[in-house]
From Swiss-Prot:
Domain (S1 motif) ranges: 664-733
Annotated source species: Mycobacteroides abscessus (strain ATCC 19977 / DSM 44196 / CCUG 20993 / CIP 104536 / JCM 13569 / NCTC 13031 / TMC 1543 / L948)
GO biological process, alphabetically ordered: mRNA catabolic process; RNA processing
SUPFAM superfamilies, alphabetized: Eukaryotic type KH-domain (KH-domain type I), Nucleic acid-binding proteins, Polynucleotide phosphorylase/guanosine pentaphosphate synthase (PNPase/GPSI), domain 3, Ribonuclease PH domain 2-like, Ribosomal protein S5 domain 2-like
Name this polypeptide is given: Polyribonucleotide nucleotidyltransferase
Localization terms from the record: Cytoplasm
Positions of the UniProt region annotated as Disordered: 734-755
């Protein structure tokens, strides 16, 4: 790896990723050609066909009234990158896709903690997808591009950050796998980190992980592949480090030739030392007592009272510095919470470090929902609701990713009342989309195939109460609701949120010892005050999803392995509680549609649909069933009851698998046409017969056919004759005769599977 000046002022550096028998991937960074007015701009290439432009810009003046770092990350998917015109009404890109939003979060999570604390200038990173090979995913390339452009921008940034996707394929961790290679993977991880240490003794500090088991993991395990256990996941994190180091080195080399010098940016520390000392003097003792209150509401109320008292007592000496007092009070709270965990192995709600809060699980909590459940863990309360529908109701995805439809959709809602607050209610924010995606990925590996369960599934998680990891609560509630809806999951899935606290603790002999304490089932405060939080979902046998964020410059591998093992113990406990509520799929709700799958010959699809959809629309109108036909001849028939579905199937089979009617068969037909000499009656789709006018009067002469029957009338008829040309002659059958007659022989249906 080295930097090259390919033209005057245009530099590039390259990182080569060697995957052995799985091939080599090349990541190239170029600067000096595009977007030259941005503070930093980089074009990143993956094997020359996938091309992203990342720009970083900074405001000239700080937002000194902000008490947070104003970083914005945007990902712009341009449909021309895949040679497509947008499918929207105006034929241009609109709101960002879910893939783009999730990529923004992947970029933000490792970049944000890499900026110096106290920075208040607005920073905006925009990544534009210019070209995309359909065999590639662009998200991890975007992490590297965003880091590289920020590294060049002259900002107080402690990068670079490297990002890599590694997938476990045939026992090997493969970096930057293609979409085709991912189909053979059992586990897929996006890992971001940065180099730490000296040149001779450098390591990679993992900053962020987003991981999941693949859709077909269970089939691969059954075929002999190793299951993605906690041990395997830890090995994958280690396997990602050399790739991250190579990507960081390439960015460093580019910055060495093209980066702007770091500018002068005013920093706004949260508080000065004199404020913290004053707050600690008056608040340490009462705050320590308040932090021992187990209940969240009572603890928060008492803490707020102490904060108001501290503000009042210090106002005279620190007039105009109320924000600093508030920040110092928060810092003191963090210190006390962490000290109690590290020294006493006890937490603010009185639990030990491995204890789980009280668990509760129940199903069928909403009367008319197809499936519903309520899962509670302490003060976190999640309601899961499942809705089943026809496959044609699957979500159509118009993005640059390989996925074009989503049969399983998970939507997560986090209303403000879940934390006892007021706020905006409406379209989901990025956080809600991210939490929903995590819970969705956790369940996908255990969902039945479309052949096993021909339904589109919408899962909604309502966060009704929040005090720690509503996303993992959503995983548990989703499993319960799906089973209640009758979905035959391959295994139940549960999730748990874990935390890690570390610090140097002074021992009795005056020496210091570095301690790491892993916390099971973290509270909201522990999430905010800890050094790492990670969420693990899975079955009793393997991990299905994992999300990790850390502020530490490196976690000892044995510490991480122990924390993952601790998470599995907690997950097993939760699965046992869930099994007491429901341990197998329930009978489907009477309000859920019944969907039957049949096959028709591909060359008969056009006949079933009819010109301009006339035939399929008539079947739908007559039977009340919903019908969806796939290109391979699979037909999904859905109806509120089995009789309607069977009527539609009979009509479809009569067209696609026709059986010639026989003399003596009786049908309830529909009059489709009247003439001077009789009435034509539809027996089956495409099969009509004639009732002569002389047969309509029951032995009496009639002047007009319309005096007896009209178009649209239903009439019971019997086949009297079929001539050598296939013309069918019918005679009316009286109600008495029809009641005594055996049921008519209908066309035999194709093999059907009913759910």
């Amino acid at each position: 790896m080295s930097v090259t000046e390919i033209e005057e002022g245009i530099f590039e550096s390259t990182a080569t990723i060697d995957n052995g028998s799985f091939g080599t991937r090349t990541i190239r960074f170029e600067t000096g050609r595009l977007a030259l007015q941005a503070a930093g701009s980089v074009v990143a290439y993956l094997d020359d066909e996938t091309m992203l432009l990342s720009t970083t810009a900074a405001s000239k003046t700080p937002k000194d009234h902000f008490d947070f770092f104003p970083l914005t990350v945007d990902v712009e998917e341009r449909m021309y990158a895949a040679g497509r015109i947008p499918g929207s009404f105006f034929r241009r890109e609109g709101r960002p896709s879910t893939d783009a939003i999730l990529t923004c979060r992947l970029i933000d999570r490792p970049l944000r903690p890499s900026f110096v604390s106290g920075l208040r200038n607005e920073i905006q990173v925009v990544v534009t997808v210019l070209s995309l090979n359909p065999a590639d995913l662009y998200d991890v390339l975007a992490i590297n591009a965003a880091s590289a452009s920020t590294q060049l921008a002259g900002l107080p940034f402690s990068g670079p950050v490297g990002g890599v996707r590694v997938a476990l394929i045939e026992g090997q961790w493969v970096a930057f796998p293609t979409v085709e290679q991912l189909e053979k993977a059992v586990f897929d991880m996006v890992v971001a980190g940065r180099k730490v240490g000296t040149a001779g003794d450098s390591d990679v500090a993992i900053m962020m992980v987003e991981a999941e088991a693949t859709d077909n993991v269970i089939a691969l395990i059954d075929g002999g592949a190793g299951a993605p256990t906690e041990t395997v996941v830890a090995e994958g994190l280690e396997a990602a480090k050399p790739f991250i180091a190579a990507l960081c080195t390439a960015q460093e080399e580019l910055a060495g030739s093209a980066a702007k010098p770091t500018g002068e940016f005013p920093l706004f520390p949260d508080y000065q030392d004199d404020v913290y000392a004053a707050v600690a003097a008056v608040a340490t003792e009462p705050l320590s007592q308040a932090l021992s209150i187990a209940g969240k509401a009572e603890r928060d109320e008492k803490t707020d009272e102490i904060k108001v008292d501290v503000l009042g007592r210090l106002q005279e000496g620190f007039d105009g510095r109320e924000k600093e007092i508030g920040a110092a009070f928060r810092s003191l709270t963090k210190k006390l919470v962490r000290q109690r965990i590290l020294k006493d192995q006890f937490r603010i709600d009185g639990r030990g470090v491995t204890d789980i809060r009280a668990l509760s699980a129940e199903v069928a909590v909403i009367p008319r929902a197809h499936g519903s459940a309520l899962f509670e863990r302490g003060e976190t309360q999640i309601m899961g609701v499942t809705t089943l529908d026809m496959i044609k109701m699957a979500q159509q995805v118009d993005s640059l990713g390989p996925e074009t439809t989503k049969r399983y959709m998970h939507h997560y809602n986090f209303p403000p009342f879940s934390t006892g607050e007021t706020g905006r209610v409406g379209s989901p924010k990025r956080r809600e989309i991210g939490h929903g995606a995590l819970a969705e990925r956790a369940l996908i590996p255990v969902l039945p195939s479309i052949e096993e369960f021909p339904y589109a599934i919408r899962q909604v998680s309502e966060a009704l109460g929040s005090n720690g990891s509503t996303s993992m609560g959503s995983v548990c509630a989703s499993t319960l609701a799906l089973l209640n809806a009758g979905v035959p999951l391959k295994a139940p899935v549960a999730g748990i949120a874990m935390g890690l606290v570390s610090d140097d603790i002074e021992l009795a002999d005056g020496t210091a010892e570095r301690r790491f304490v892993a916390l099971t089932d973290i509270l909201g405060a522990e999430d905010a005050f800890g050094d790492m939080d990670f969420k693990v979902a899975g079955t009793k046998d393997f991990v299905t999803a994992l999300q990790l964020d850390t502020k530490l410059d490196g976690i000892p591998s044995q510490v991480l392995a122990a924390a993952l093992s601790q998470a599995k113990d907690a997950r097993t406990t939760i699965l046992e509680v869930m099994a007491e509520a429901i341990d197998a799929p329930d009978e489907m709700s009477p309000y859920a549609p019944r969907i039957t799958t049949i096959k028709v010959p591909v060359d008969k699809i056009g006949e079933v649909i009819g010109p301009k959809g006339k035939m399929i629309n008539s079947i739908t109108e007559e039977t009340g069933a919903n019908i969806s036909i796939e290109d391979d001849g699979t037909v999904f028939v859905g109806a509120a009851d089995g009789a309607s579905a069977q009527a539609a199937i009979d009509k479809i089979n009569a067209i696609a698998n026709p059986q010639l009617p026989k003399i003596g068969e009786r049908f309830l037909g529909t009059v489709v046409k009247t003439t001077d000499f009789g009435a034509f009656v539809s027996l089956l789709p495409g099969r009509d017969g004639l009732v002569h006018i002389s047969k309509l009067g029951k032995g009496k002469r009639i002047a007009k056919v319309e005096d007896v029957v009209k178009v649209g009338d239903k009439i019971q008829v019997e086949i009297a004759d079929i001539d050598n040309r296939g013309k069918i002659s019918l005679v009316p059958v009286g109600e008495e005769d029809a009641a005594e007659a055996p049921a008519p022989a209908e066309a035999q249906p194709a093999d059907a599977v009913t759910q």
